[in-house]
Amino acid sequence: MKNTYEYNVTVSKVVDGDTVDVDIDLGFGMVYKKQRVRMLGIDTPESRTRDLVEKKFGKASKKHLKKLLEEAESITLISHDKGKFGRILGELFAHHIEGHPVFGHRVNVNEQMIADHHAVPYTGENKDLVEGQHMANREVLLANGTVVLDD
């Protein structure tokens, strides 16, 4: 098993529903800037694709992730490894201010994206194997009005 490390981070950019750029606080005033993090264990629809339907769901996932992160008072990254494209593979945890419904609890943002139907569990297998789960999420997001397809 690979070593895991925990850091306080500041999200500088939400790239898409499962990828963010962060500045990592290493302590002692040292910050490792603009590090790309691929959120471990999830897959979201692509927001940069020629498939216009998938793009709508991808943009909705990106927007939802941005909202989850903006609501947090602070964010922690648990890094697990580097992926095949050189990105950090990790889990993001949101910490909330007093008065927020989950104050005092550390929310795993990766898992929250799955619970909110914006992501599916994914461990690197062939993406065709999770396509059915993506389709089920689409139905939920259409039914609850999160995503509206134009005629």
Which residues are covered by each model-predicted region?
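Small beta-barrel nucleic-acid-binding modules, primarily SNase/OB-fold domains
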Residues: M1-D151
